[in-house]
């Protein structure tokens, strides 16, 4: 429907793309009785029931899902109670799978296994144990196949089943948002694209900003009186914890993340966290990481507010691809959503490159690799061969090879895809363009708001590599910038600076000002001294102190040094006036014009006139 498919479909599908029309309210089984072999099914819409269709299909099925929550969700659904479904993931043993297979054969039931990629080997081994040939007897379906490209850089095992996959007689891949696949083994595949004949656009409000925290705070204030649950999708538990803490929502929040992140948050004292989704865990604010972006069904009665967050500087991996990520996230809610927002900042240092330019970079990297191999093969001595071999091991191109030194095409696709996504976050115009290029998916409301305190400055303050002086200097610049803001906003920013940075600088800026701190060269020792002196002067020249001093001492009267010292000490202690230096008889010169005089053997002062007017 007016969308350019070359960005999204496997580029090696050169011969046939079949389109099937679907009406509003229809599911996949109503327009496609079963998924054909050697097919990449482009669902276009999430929630069409591709997994449901395969679990109900009259054949043995093994479905590879991207992660465990998807499988757990299907196992719990009442609609699959009679489907003989077995979920396989970490903790499910090979023997347990074999027992299931034997029982299924005994009862003449179809095999219906859902497994993570990492656990597929256990399924394969268990099938061999009981004499089942997966490649000839089962339909192998790779669900949410875009994850093969998206995740392979940090999760290499996700592509482990692919060699086996291509050797199966009956096989297919499915996703609403497939991504380019350069693997030549797709040459004999067809693409079937589901084409809705109705408007399926979702409205999304993009909130571009230079301060993600403040934008989140402002957005939350827009629906603070709304009882609708809010679902945040943020692929960084550090960012989640920081946002919960700084927005004051931590006591009304639940977090859903990996087991490792669960422990991390519990170590920070936050316990309302789980690696499994459950309606019983829902809070006013619900925070989910990327393991809940795809395939997973969130079935709740309300139409929630959905907020996606991208923080380019501290969590580059939180950059969302409008096509693959945003579409998938908004498709998690089976009863629909109320409203959707994408809060994001931008990094102008990210390189903007076209796909062709990225491919040239890849090809150059490959050329360097191939050249060194050629030189190594032609080297005449062992020492030369070793030198070339050691150099080869350091080349960037190795990231595109599997453990047998073969090209991992999914790693190549991942590199291209990641570099393209980075370009979206160079500036607001790039992201807006990316959203528009998704075609029929979104109606965009675009807002861009800048704040005096930028995320880039917060990075400087939080960085362990930034010098303390540079951090303090940055804080002073921020404090100077926010000094003209509305009182409540300025107070919020100051609290954040105390949280992220140095409380002394915030305190001293209020009392000493920018120029004085710069004059003191941002030195904590000198700043503390200046604060003490200023406070001493303020306290010691306050009305109460002056009244006591001028009541004790009179003009045109001589006082001995010991008397002056004792009386001033008594007054300072009575009023709890701080003082950095010892109080002596000379301190009286802060309050009186006086002449140094001796009487007999004692030195003292003749007080001429007061320096302050107390009325």
Per-range role (PLM):
Residues 1-285, 292-296, 300-341, 348-381, ...:
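N-terminal helicase ATP-binding lobe
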């Amino acid at each position: 429907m007016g969308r350019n498919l070359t960005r999204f479909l496997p580029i090696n599908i050169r011969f046939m793309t079949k389109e099937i029309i679907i009406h509003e309210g229809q599911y996949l089984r109503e327009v496609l009785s079963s998924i054909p072999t050697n097919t990449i099914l482009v669902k276009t819409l999430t929630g069409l029931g591709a997994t449901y269709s395969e679990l109900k299909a009259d054949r043995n099925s093994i479905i590879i899902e991207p992660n465990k929550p998807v499988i757990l969700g299907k196992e719990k659904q009442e609609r699959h109670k009679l489907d003989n479904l077995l979920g396989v993931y970490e903790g499910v043993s090979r023997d347990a799978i074999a027992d299931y297979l034997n029982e299924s054969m005994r009862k003449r039931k179809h095999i219906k296994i859902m497994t993570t990629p990492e656990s597929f080997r256990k399924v394969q081994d268990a099938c061999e144990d009981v004499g089942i040939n997966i490649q000839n007897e089962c339909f192998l379906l790779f669900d949410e196949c875009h994850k093969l490209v998206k995740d392979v850089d940090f999760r290499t095992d996700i592509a482990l089943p692919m060699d086996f996959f291509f050797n199966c007689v009956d096989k297919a891949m499915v996703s609403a948002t497939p991504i380019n696949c350069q693997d030549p083994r797709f040459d004999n595949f067809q693409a079937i694209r589901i084409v809705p004949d109705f408007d399926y656009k979702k409205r999304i409000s993009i909130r571009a900003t230079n301060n993600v925290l403040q934008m989140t705070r402002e957005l939350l204030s827009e629906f603070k009186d709304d009882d609708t649950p809010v679902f945040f999708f943020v692929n960084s538990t550090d960012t989640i914890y920081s946002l919960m803490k700084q927005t004051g929502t931590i006591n009304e929040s639940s977090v859903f993340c990996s087991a490792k992140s669960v422990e991390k948050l519990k170590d920070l004292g936050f316990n309302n966290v789980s690696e499994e989704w459950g309606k019983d865990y829902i809070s006013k604010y619900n925070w989910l990481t990327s393991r809940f972006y795809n395939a997973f069904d969130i079935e709740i009665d309300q139409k929630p507010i959905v907020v996606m967050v991208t923080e380019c500087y501290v969590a580059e991996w939180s950059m969302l691809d409008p096509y693959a990520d945003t579409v998938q996230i908004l498709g998690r809610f089976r009863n629909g959503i109320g409203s959707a927002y994408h809060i994001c900042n931008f990094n102008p240092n990210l390189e903007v490159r076209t796909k062709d330019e990225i491919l040239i970079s890849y090809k150059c990297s490959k050329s360097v690799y191939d050249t060194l191999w050629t030189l190594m093969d032609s080297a005449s001595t062992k020492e030369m061969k070793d030198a070339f071999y050691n150099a080869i091991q350091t080349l960037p191109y190795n990231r595109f090879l599997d453990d047998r030194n073969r090209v991992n095409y999914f790693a190549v696709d991942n590199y291209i895809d990641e570099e393209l996504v980075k370009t979206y976050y160079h500036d607001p115009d790039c992201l807006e363009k990316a959203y528009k290029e998704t075609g029929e998916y979104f109606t965009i409301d675009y807002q861009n708001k800048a704040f005096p305190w930028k995320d880039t400055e917060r990075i400087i303050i939080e960085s362990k590599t930034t010098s303390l002086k540079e951090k303090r200097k940055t804080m002073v610049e921020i404090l100077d910038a926010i000094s003209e803001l509305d009182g409540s906003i300025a107070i919020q920013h100051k609290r954040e600076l105390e949280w992220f940075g140095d409380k002394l600088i915030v305190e001293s800026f209020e009392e000493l000002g920018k120029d004085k701190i710069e004059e003191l060269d941002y030195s904590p020792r000198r700043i503390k001294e200046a604060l003490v002196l200023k406070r001493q002067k303020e306290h010691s020249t306050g009305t109460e102190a002056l009244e006591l001093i001028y009541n004790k001492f009179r003009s045109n009267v001589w006082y001995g040094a010991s008397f002056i010292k004792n009386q001033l000490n008594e007054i300072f202690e009575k009023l709890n006036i701080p003082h950095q230096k010892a109080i002596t008889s000379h301190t009286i010169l802060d309050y009186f014009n006086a002449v140094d005089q001796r009487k007999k053997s004692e030195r003292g002062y003749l007080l001429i006139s007061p320096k302050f007017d107390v009325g």
